[in-house]
Amino acid sequence: MSNCFTHINADGNAHMVDVTEKAVTEREARAEAFIDMAPDTLAMIMNGSHHKGDVFATARIAGIQAAKKTSDLIPLCHPLMLTKVEVELEAQPEHNRVRITSLCKLSGKTGVEMEALTAASVAALTIYDMCKAVQKDMIISQVRLLEKRGGKSGHFKA
């Protein structure tokens, strides 16, 4: 692990990292997020009775779209040609929450961690948006990188 911030130059200014000379390698990242809610809200999602429609399908598409738009949201992220984005949603009624996991892949010169984190985060935000009419105190938490593969820094697993 590096002991310096790669997005800060010698003058202390933020800059986009130059990846011109880096080798193209297979890159993969997995992330997760959770959204806690009342049992009744989760039941609405699970049994399909939510008045806005299929919450999981909408959140999945939002997460995929968010991964593709990460460089528009995070100023110093490189625009990437993603080859795979997967967003999975799992109701966990025993914990009154939904677990969101994302997977992003590409062959490229820079990693896809931010894309995976953005996918999981925006999927959680979409669930909040769709359910806020019935519950405003839902909690989005534990957004984290689960695993990354490829590149100079190698393999990371939480």
Swiss-Prot record:
InterPro entries: MoaC, MoaC_bact/euk, MoaC_sf, MoCo_biosynth_MoaA/MoaC, Mopterin_CF_biosynth-C_dom. Pathway: Cofactor biosynthesis; molybdopterin biosynthesis. Substrate binds at residues 76-78, 114-115. SUPFAM superfamilies: Molybdenum cofactor biosynthesis protein C, MoaC (SSF55040). Its EC number is 4.6.1.17. The active site is at 129. It comes from the Bacteria. GO terms for molecular function: cyclic pyranopterin monophosphate synthase activity; GTP 3',8'-cyclase activity. It holds the Pfam family MoaC. One of its GO terms (biological process) is Mo-molybdopterin cofactor biosynthetic process. Catalyzes the conversion of (8S)-3',8-cyclo-7,8-dihydroguanosine 5'-triphosphate to cyclic pyranopterin monophosphate (cPMP). Homohexamer; trimer of dimers. This is Cyclic pyranopterin monophosphate synthase.
